[in-house]
Amino acid sequence: MANIKSAIKRAELNVKQNEKNSAQKSAMRTAIKAFEANPSEELFRAASSAIDKAETKGLIHKNKASRDKARLSAKLVK
């Protein structure tokens, strides 16, 4: 455990941020799974939006976001 006051505060903030990031990533994965279970234009937009939000917040790399959206788009076209 940290001894310095600022380090203790940062550790607490890191825990909160980790929970927030995990929730955001989970929401993204849930949106993707919902689309894959039942491909539709509406679910594609929701999944694409979730991916973009995760990319903007730095949770996933921009290339991964692009790759994921391309794969979802290909499934929508089929």
Curated annotation (Swiss-Prot):
Record's keyword terms, sorted: Ribonucleoprotein, Ribosomal protein, RNA-binding, rRNA-binding
One Gene Ontology CC term in the entry: small ribosomal subunit
Pfam family for this entry, one: Ribosomal_S20p
TM ranges: none
An example Gene Ontology molecular-function term: structural constituent of ribosome
Gene Ontology BP, a term: translation
Job description of the protein: Binds directly to 16S ribosomal RNA.
Listed NCBIfam families: S20
Family that this chain belongs to: Belongs to the bacterial ribosomal protein bS20 family.
PANTHER family for the chain: 30S RIBOSOMAL PROTEIN S20 (PTHR33398), SMALL RIBOSOMAL SUBUNIT PROTEIN BS20C (PTHR33398:SF1)
Name of this chain's protein: Small ribosomal subunit protein bS20
Higher taxonomy: Bacteria, Bacillati, Bacillota, Bacilli, Lactobacillales
